[in-house]
Structure formats: C-alpha cells, structure tokens
C-alpha cells in the first residue's frame, strides 16, 4: 500500500467571497460581477487543501469562531477531505472573512474583516501528533503557534515549511530561521531591509534552514541552499 504523506498545516482559515470582474475600478462606482464564488481561504487552510488534492493526508490546525462563518469555513475544508478534528472553536469570536475582486488579468483587490477574539495561547495544540507527521506547514498569521509547531517538528526531525507572507520583519525573520524551508513573499523579503532578492535571500538564510526561498510573481521563484542561489 502506497504511503500517503501526512502534513499538518497551522495558521489562518477564512471564508472568501470572490467577485470576478473585467477590471478593478479606480474610482467609486457600482458595477456587476461576471462571476461570484464563495470558498474557503487563508494560507494554511489552502495549503491543507493543496496537500489533499495532491494525494496526501492533511490536518488543519487553527482557531475559528463559533459563528456562521466559522461553520462555513469548516464545511469547506471537510468537503475537501481535510481533517479538522484539531480546530479550536472559540466561543463568541468572529471568524475571518474577505471580499475579493479578481480581474481578467488575475490582479486582485482584497478587503478583509479580521478575526476577533482569537487569543495567542498555544497550550491546546496537540503537539504530540507532530511525531506522526511527515512534514508541517505554518503561515505568519499566528506566530506563537508557528513557533510551537516548528520546534516540535525539529524535535521530530521532520521538514517544516514557513509561508513568510507578511508581518513584523524582525518577528517573521526569527520564525523563518526556526523552519527548515521558509519561503518569503517578495514584499516581505524587501521589508527585511537586506536589499535586492539575490542579496536578501542569502542574508535571511540561517538557523534551521535547509533552503530559504522567495516567490517573485511572474518572474518565478529563487532559493538559496547555503551555498548556491
């Protein structure tokens, strides 16, 4: 029987309302959408869905309010086959939702209603499960959770992937160096103040890193392995 890699994904999950339009307006206006989709979103949640669609087994670990939006977020993940048994439902909290305009060139405009009532506490995380996983993934939206997960992954000697998309530069760099495979967005890497990507990636490399990468949109992806870029 073929082994299915098991990946734990920790971080944000949202409910995205996506409006496809010809162009994103630059001035106030009323206009109709070409298409409307309601779907799950959030970096960690989407990573879990990607793992499942690629043939792996995925668990999503994160915090969700006990509101209607939270119910919809979990239904979307369950429909994709993602294990949500370790999601922490927070009484009285507001789950995160976003309205997203996407034009015909693929450009986007996002307006998010942030989650409310999400404590930073990590004591509920079932970190003993990490030893049974093949890899872990975390985004930058819940930093204490990412640190706890990456430390558990290091103890279990398994790879850890960090989606370094946004946040305080010093905090994000600290977390990135606790992962084996951090990948920065280009704006996040720029915010570190290390210069152009080919200079910044080697400077960001450190700690537990096996590789350190950056996504550059249509220009592709660069990574540094400690010797070569």
Predicted regions: what is each one?
Residues 1-13, 75-89, 100-229:
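Ribokinase/PfkB-type carbohydrate-kinase core domain
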Residues 1-63, 68-72, 79:
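Glycine-rich phosphate/adenosyl-contacting loop at the front of the ribokinase-like
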Residues 47, 96-98, 210:
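Residue-level marker for the onset of beta-strands and adjacent loop->beta junctions
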Residues 70-71, 95-97, 172-173:
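Short Asp/Glu-rich motifs
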């Amino acid at each position: 029987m073929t082994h299915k890699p098991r990946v734990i994904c920790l971080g944000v999950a949202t409910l995205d309302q996506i409006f496809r339009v010809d162009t994103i307006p630059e001035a106030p206006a009323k206009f109709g959408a070409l298409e409307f989709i309601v779907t799950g979103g959030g970096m960690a949640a989407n990573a879990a869905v990607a793992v499942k669609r690629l043939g792996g087994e995925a668990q999503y670990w994160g915090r969700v309010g006990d509101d209607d939006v939270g119910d919809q977020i979990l239904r979307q993940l369950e429909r994709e086959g993602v294990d949500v048994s370790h999601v922490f439902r927070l009484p009285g909290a507001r789950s995160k939702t976003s309205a997203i305009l996407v034009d015909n060139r693929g450009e986007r405009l996002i307006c998010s209603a942030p989650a409310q009532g999400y404590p930073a506490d990590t004591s509920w995380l079932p970190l003993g499960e990490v030893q049974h996983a093949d890899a872990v993934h975390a985004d930058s939206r819940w930093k204490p959770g990412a640190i706890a997960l990456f430390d558990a992954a290091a103890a279990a000697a398994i790879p850890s992937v960090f989606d370094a998309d946004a946040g305080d530069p010093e905090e994000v760099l600290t977390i990135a160096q606790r992962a084996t495979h951090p990948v920065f967005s280009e704006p996040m890497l720029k915010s570190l103040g290390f210069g152009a990507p080919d200079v910044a990636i080697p400077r960001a490399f450190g700690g537990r890193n096996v590789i350190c990468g950056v996504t550059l949109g249509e220009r592709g992806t660069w990574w540094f392995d400690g010797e070569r870029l």
